Amino acid sequence: MINSPGVLRLFTWIASIMLAIAPTQLHAQPRTSEFKLANGLQVVVIPDHRAPVVTHMIWYKVGAADEPKGVSGIAHFLEHLMFKSTDKIPLGEFSKIVARLGGNDNAFTGHDVTSYFQRISKERLGTVMEMEADRMVNLRLTEKEVLTERDVILEERRSRIENNPAAIMDEQMNAALYYSHPYGIPVIGWEHEMAKLSPQDAMTFYKHFYAPNNAVLVVAGDVTADEVKALAEKTYGQIPANPTVGATRFRPQDPPQRAARRVEYSDPRAGKASFHRDYVVPSYMTAKPGEAEALDLLMKIAADGATSRLYKRLVVDEKIASSAGGSYSGSGLDYGTISLYAVAAGSPADLPKIEASLDKVMAELRDNGVTDAELTRAKSSYIADYIYENDDQASLARRYGWGLALGRTVAQIEGWPDAISKVTADDIKKAASTYLDTRRSVTGYLTPSVEAPRAEQSAPKSRS
């Protein structure tokens, strides 16, 4: 831990130098190329000629928050089913073919996006592009395959959620955080709805959302824009656009949040008691200019790591928590979240003390803001992470793919370090004053018990 004034001054000086030179370093990164095919597929190429490998990612502008009511989990379920078969690729062979070519592949589903990706040698890029384009439009499913895979996702839910008290707590708090917005529904789905998902549900979702004009292709690695364009036109370019996919994504929006909510969950499988607090805040897509960056820096200072205010107050000074932290998640299309937690060092009876101390830390941030030294350290840490990420091909592709799939531009994505560097202490104080408001939040207590697992949500109470 840094506690010497001299060391702190040295650290601040070094951080200032990093901020001064960071823009030059960042602008030296490989230049991206962007183009669009005639069928609407957006393509971004990120050259990286250090090794003869490429990362190929296709991002669909659809996620769990786009699901029709009553079929929660269908977006994630379809992600699983995409590894079944087409007329060209036999059942279960997609990943095996990629592996035989010396590569690896995976996929993931979020509330707003679904992505499929491969890392492969440069000379095999055309093959994986052909395979990925094939399953964009030619997926074949049998009832037996769908029902078998449905059992797989139900077991996944049981192992990841039902057998994990912390995951149950997170799910219950998230459901309480949103009034009607689908972010309150877990990506994996509610079990009672997952159990009824059918082949027709999957194919209806697939045929509507999986189309070139609803996707972004990102290729990073030892390639040129001309090479990728030729391959993209030969593969993805042969797929017609789907005119039924709208440019705007319609989701129910929540009304203003006016009442704090609480969730208490007891489970005999829980270890130490823990405190949780989530706030609904703007995302990078919905915040005013500079506001999301201010929230990022606010949480870096408030709750990220052992030097954060929250950790020092609860763990080091008061010793009422064994760990504490938090973060800002601003990657949502409609909303972002601030999440805070602390694990009690003692018994569940300490949770009210933890809550009171955490509230004091939040009040100090609202009333007094942050110091210049804290702000400089937070900026330099973020920009250093950004620079290091530029050396990771997959991270680069993910950065561009996720942002573009949400509707951000290449200029906005590449301009993030400059936007971070322009945030002032006043900007952070304003963000804290506006958004660290318990009326926008859900507070949770997770406690061990000898009782059967239960979850309770109290009725919202108006704040006087």
Over which residues does each language-model region extend?
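N-terminal secretory signal peptides that target proteins for export/translocation
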Residues: M1-L8
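M16 family metallopeptidases and their MPP-like homologs
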Residues: I46, A51-E67, G73-F77, L91-R135, ...
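Sec/Tat signal peptide C-region and signal peptidase I cleavage site
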Residues: T24-A28
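His/Glu-based metal-binding/catalytic segments typifying zinc-dependent metallopeptidases
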Residues: R158, A175, T244-T307
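Bacterial N-terminal signal peptides
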Residues: R9-A22
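Non-catalytic, conformational "gating/processing" segments within enzyme and secreted inhibitor domains
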Residues: R150, Q200-T235, R440
